């Protein structure tokens, strides 16, 4: 039985057995026991018993002021409060820590030097 552990593009992030665990696209995010647990599209992020628990739009999903734990969207360029102000690129799924615009540009300059 094939096992895809993590693929952070438009498609599957993790499959265990026949069960989709994570999907970082525009639609379903997690299926457990035949139920959609989390939905990472432009509107709701997680539902429990018909209640919206988290919203995956331009807001951060987990942010403690310095660390971004999880964001199912684009590369983050600037955070103001708990809102993502600027972002670019299609792929980032999870990071630890946060780079400012200046730090990010410096990193890009180093990578392409």
Question: Positions of the model-derived regions?
Answer:
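Long terminal segments
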Residues: 1-26, 33-34, 42-43, 49-113
């Amino acid at each position: 039985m094939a096992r895809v552990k993590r693929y952070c593009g438009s498609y599957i992030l993790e499959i265990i057995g026949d069960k989709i665990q994570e999907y970082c696209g525009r639609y379903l995010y997690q299926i457990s026991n035949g139920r959609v647990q989390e939905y990472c599209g432009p509107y709701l992020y997680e539902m429990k018993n018909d209640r919206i628990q988290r919203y995956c739009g331009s807001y951060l999903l987990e942010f403690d002021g310095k660390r971004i734990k999880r964001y199912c969207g684009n590369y983050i360029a600037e955070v103001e409060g708990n809102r993502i102000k600027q972002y670019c690129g299609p792929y980032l799924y999870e990071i630890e820590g946060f780079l400012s615009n200046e730090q990010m540009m410096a990193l890009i300059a180093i990578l392409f030097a």
